[in-house]
Amino acid sequence: MKISSGAINFSTIPNQVKKLITSIREHTKNGLTSKITSVKNTHTSLNEKFKTGKDSPIEFALPQKIKDFFQPKDKNTLNKTLITVKNIKDTNNAGKKNISAEDVSKMNAAFMRKHIANQTCDYNYRMTGAAPLPGGVSVSANNRPTVSEGRTPPVSPSLSLQATSSPSSPADWAKKLTDAVLRQKAGEALTAADRDFSNADFRNITFSKILPPSFMERDGDIIKGFNFSNSKFTYSDISHLHFDECRFTYSTLSDVVCSNTKFSNSDMNEVFLQYSITTQQQPSFIDTTLKNTLIRHKANLSGVILNEPDNSSPPSVSGGGNFIRLGDIWLQMPLLWTENAVDGFLNHEHNNGKSILMTIDSLPDKYSQEKVQAMEDLVKSLRGGRLTEACIRPVESSLVSVLAHPPYTQSALISEWLGPVQERFFAHQCQTYNDVPLPAPDTYYQQRILPVLLDSFDRNSAAMTTHSGLFNQVILHCMTGVDCTDGTRQKAAALYEQYLAHPAVSPHIHNGLFGNYDGSPDWTTRAADNFLLLSSQDSDTAMMLSTDTLLTMLNPTPDTAWDNFYLLRAGENVSTAQISPVELFRHDFPVFLAAFNQQATQRRFGELIDIILSTEEHGELNQQFLAATNQKHSTVKLIDDASVSRLATIFDPLLPEGKLSPAHYQHILSAYHLTDATPQKQAETLFCLSTAFARYSSSAIFGTEHDSPPALRGYAEALMQKAWELSPAIFPSSEQFTEWSDRFHGLHGAFTCTSVVADSMQRHARKYFPSVLSSILPLAWA
């Protein structure tokens, strides 16, 4: 019989114990019996030496070092050690013929180290509460250093040499794991026994509280090679940890928080894995097996290794449950398809991208057969649930985002069931997004929804013209989406060719303006006018615009130009100068109306009109001034004598000596919340208001090429003068200021065209304080 006690790390044992063991090893080489006698009933001798009582059973002849090592108060420790030594002797005698002297020495040394450590540490903790010192040393009541069992674990057990008992509580298990993990982190080579945490109990343990932060960091420390089989992790929190080459077989991970937990190269077979709803980020499984493991319906299985399923029965869970197979994994299903179950299991668009659909689809393509089989089982379950259209409606988008793509389109069962669902989804998209912009398409939308919409338009080509607002948006996002595939772009371009060939569309593209100017789209540049939207009211009217213009009008900024398009009637370009953008959008192209109105509400020029022309006294003029801001050109002119006189009556009191009256100036500051603003901020606002009144006085609005209302020119110049007084720095130069002032009044031979002045001032404001200009200037004038 060959017995090996394994290697002993003497570097972790205090010097006194080293000397003790060395002495014992020397004695055991000589047969041990020369120094240790058999048991005698010498009660008196022991009484005298240790005061232990009449029945002490042992007399010994150990080296003086052992006697000196223990004090009388350590008598129990000493007795246990002596019994151990006797056992060593008996074992030596029994196996003397089959055990080499070297093995005897190793075995005796291991026993001595083990028991001295156990008993002395036990004495320290139970009698004195002494804490271990660094390196595994503690101090006993007699101030003698001892080996701490908690700091220097025994070597790998062989045969019956292991005497360590399992921890009795989750806290003890956590402490043991912390010790082992830290030793591994320090570079110590752990034995299989060191890494054996089978049948452990980690219930309610938050691992971030027992491990250093480095284990929770991205690409941080790893828990590697541990055996957690048949262990309990119920209600524990293992978030952000990385377990590599670990075994969790038959373990219970019920209501465990495992946000962003990584399992790699691990065995998680036969595990009950239902992580807590507080898990915010899904755990990941990389090259990990999950045979017969119960998985929640919101898991990511992209790195799982599937194998052939066996004939095992579904797992039993409290409250019962339905299950489907995904390869050799069990996926939990609801008992009944209630409204809550439909939302919770199927609606990943409402549940942070998590659903049973996404769980199945997360497997690699090499498991296509298993994925299709699982989806077919899911569809059978849904079909058996006899769900109404109203119940399915909230999850139609989620369903088609997965099932309308390969490999599931290869299944006749899935395609037959999904067909009506996809038709209803498409009808809802047409109804909702023909007149309003689609949400900004993210990666999910570009890769999962846009291809479905293309497929639906392909099946229902009439919808391309009846819902050209939606169709053009879909093509736009397919051609510009950075996450769209080449296949998606090619299909979008092919569908648009069909659209351009439609009789309602083709008359508008052969005018030398469309695309590459010959009637074909030019997808090589976003500046080409490739898009053509049909009017929702008049089939003879269309809007032609470029990719960039369409994008900015659907998602505008304060600087968006709302007239950078061609308006076509019967294929001919018509002027939009006297067309109100808001009326054009409301009547013909409602897809832009909401965005335009939203930007218009941020323009505050009308507040000054209400100050000057109150609706109570000047209701008609108030409406004329506001209506003029909705178009680039006005047919109403205010240059006749009656109009000039009326305007002078209104504006002259505001401009004593040609300057803003203090009271009127304060009204302006109050209306635009500038009372406490800096002089520069006040000046920028007055400058922009001046550009607007310069526009009023020009031939584009209330003036003509040869005449303009003097009151409006004078008011525009007074606003500019006040801006100069407040902050000359906002002007290009004093010379430019003087030139603009002269143009307002025709002084010093200056050309009096206020349209030129308005354009020049507007360009300057857009360059140096665009946000102020965008908050004031009417959209139609921008």
Swiss-Prot record:
Stretches the record annotates as Disordered: 136-171
UniProt biased composition (Low complexity): 157-171
Entries under InterPro entries matching the protein: SopA-like_cat, SopA-like_catalytic_sf, SopA-like_central
Alphabetized Pfam families for the sequence: SopA, SopA_C
Broadest EC class assigned to this enzyme: transferase
Posttranslational mods: Ubiquitinated in the presence of host E1 ubiquitin-activating enzyme, E2 ubiquitin-conjugating enzyme and ubiquitin.
Keywords, alphabetical: Secreted, Transferase, Ubl conjugation, Ubl conjugation pathway, Virulence
GO molecular function, one term: ubiquitin-protein transferase activity
Superkingdom assignment: Bacteria
Chief subcellular location: secreted
Keyword Transferase carried by entry: yes
Protein localization: Secreted; Host cell
Active site: C753
A GO biological-process term: protein ubiquitination
GO CC terms, sorted: extracellular region; host cell
EC number from the UniProt entry: 2.3.2.26
Catalytic activity: S-ubiquitinyl-[E2 ubiquitin-conjugating enzyme]-L-cysteine + [acceptor protein]-L-lysine = [E2 ubiquitin-conjugating enzyme]-L-cysteine + N(6)-ubiquitinyl-[acceptor protein]-L-lysine
Membership in a protein family: Belongs to the SopA E3 ligase family.
Job of this protein: Effector proteins function to alter host cell physiology and promote bacterial survival in host tissues. This protein is an E3 ubiquitin ligase that interferes with host's ubiquitination pathway. For instance, prevents host innate immune response by ubiquitinating and thus sending to degradation host E3 ubiquitin ligases TRIM56 and TRIM65.
The protein's name in its UniProt record: E3 ubiquitin-protein ligase SopA
Organism: Salmonella typhimurium (strain D23580)
Gene name per UniProt: sopA
